[in-house]
Amino acid sequence: MLKTIALDAMGGDHGPKVIVPAALSILKKHPKVKLTLVGKEDQLALLIPEKNRKSFGQRLEIIHASEEVGMDEPPSQALRTKKNSSMRVAINLVKEGQAHACVSAGNTGALMATARYVLKTLPGIDRPAIIAAFPTKNEREVRVLDLGANVDSTPENLYQFAVMGSILSSAAHNIRNPRIGLLNVGEEEIKGNELVKKANELFETRKTINYIGYVEGNTIFNNIADVVVCDGFVGNAVLKASEGVAQLIKQHAKEAFSEAWWTKLALLPAIPILKRLIRRVDPERYNGATFLGLNGIVVKSHGSANIKAFVCAVEEAIFQVDKNIPQLIKEEVAHILKEFENK
C-alpha cells in the first residue's frame, strides 16, 4: 500500500520552486510513497517535466487550491477566510483519509490553528506541541518539545508533552524507556519557576515515564536525555538559538576555506573532519518539526527551507506514517488514563 503525503505546495518563502523539486526527489528515493501537491495547478504543472509525470504516474498527483496563506497572515484570519487555501486543503486530505500526513513550510501559527481546528487533538491530550530532533555529541538525537505551540502551559500540559515525546523517541530509536528531562535553569530542586517546580513534582509522582530530573540548557546536546520538555516560550528560544549557532559554525567554516591559498593548503588534512562536523550540526538535516498530539500527522518545514531541507521534512512525515505515531500516542494515553482511574 502506498503512503500518501499531502504537500502544501504554495507554503514557505520559496513555494513551488522548492517544493516541487523536493517532491520529485522524494518519489525517486521512496518507491512506496505517493505525493499529492496541493496548490495552484497551472503553476505546479509547469514545474513538473513530462518524463517525471510519466515515470511516477499515479504516485504524483496535483489537487488545485485557489488560495494561499501569507507568511505574515494572522492565524485567525487564515482560518476564517482561507477555506480553499493550499494549507487547508492539504490538512483536509488528512482528515478525510485521502492522505496519511501533511507537510507544510507555511505560516506556523496558521498551520497550527488550522490543523487543530480540522484534525482536533487526540483523546486525553489538551494541547498539541511542536517537537523536533537536535544533534547530540554522539549519533543519537535528542527531541525537544514544546518549540512554540504553547507560550503558556500548565504542569499537566508538560506531562502530556513528556508522554508524547517519549513515544516518538521510542519509535525513532527503538528504545524501551527513553530518558525524559525537564528543562530548567539548574539541576537543584530549589531552582526554577513555579511551572517547572510543579511539573517536576508531577513527573516524579507519576511513574509512567522514565524521568531523570532537570536538564540545563548547556547539557541538552550532551546525550543525557532522549527527550527534553519545556514550555513553548523557552523551547522556541532554544530552537532559534541552536539554529543560529549551527549557521555560525557553517559560516566560519566557509570563511576559513575562502582565505589565501596557503591557508587552504594548511587546512587540507582537516577537510574530512570539518565536513563531518558541518553535516552533524546542519539545520537542514534536522528540518521537520511535528505538531504532536493531533488526530493526524502534520509536519512543519522551516519557511526558508531549500530542496534538501524540505526533503528531510517529508521523510520525517514518512517515518511517522510508518510507525503510526498518532495511534501509538492514543493507545498509551488511554492506558495511562485507565491506570489513574483504577487507583
UniProtKB/Swiss-Prot annotation:
Specify the domain of life of the species encoding this protein. Answer: Bacteria
Gene Ontology CC terms, in alphabetical order: cytoplasm
Q: Which reaction does it catalyse?
A: a fatty acyl-[ACP] + phosphate = an acyl phosphate + holo-[ACP]
Keywords tagged on the record: Cytoplasm, Lipid biosynthesis, Lipid metabolism, Phospholipid biosynthesis, Phospholipid metabolism, Transferase
Q: Where primarily located?
A: cytoplasm
Tell me the route in metabolism or biology where this protein functions. Lipid metabolism; phospholipid metabolism
Q: What compartments host this protein?
A: Cytoplasm
Pfam families per the record? FA_synthesis
Q: What is its EC number?
A: 2.3.1.274
Enzymatic class: transferase
State a single Gene Ontology molecular function.
phosphate:acyl-[acyl carrier protein] acyltransferase activity
Biological process annotations from GO: fatty acid biosynthetic process; phospholipid biosynthetic process
State the function annotated in the UniProt record. Answer: Catalyzes the reversible formation of acyl-phosphate (acyl-PO(4)) from acyl-[acyl-carrier-protein] (acyl-ACP). This enzyme utilizes acyl-ACP as fatty acyl donor, but not acyl-CoA.
Q: What does the subunit section of this Swiss-Prot or TrEMBL entry state?
A: Homodimer. Probably interacts with PlsY.
Identify the NCBIfam families for this entry. Answer: plsX
Q: Which family does it belong to?
A: Belongs to the PlsX family.
Annotated protein name in UniProt: Phosphate acyltransferase
Can you name the source organism?
Coxiella burnetii (strain CbuG_Q212) (Coxiella burnetii (strain Q212))
What taxonomic ancestry is recorded?
A: Bacteria, Pseudomonadati, Pseudomonadota, Gammaproteobacteria, Legionellales
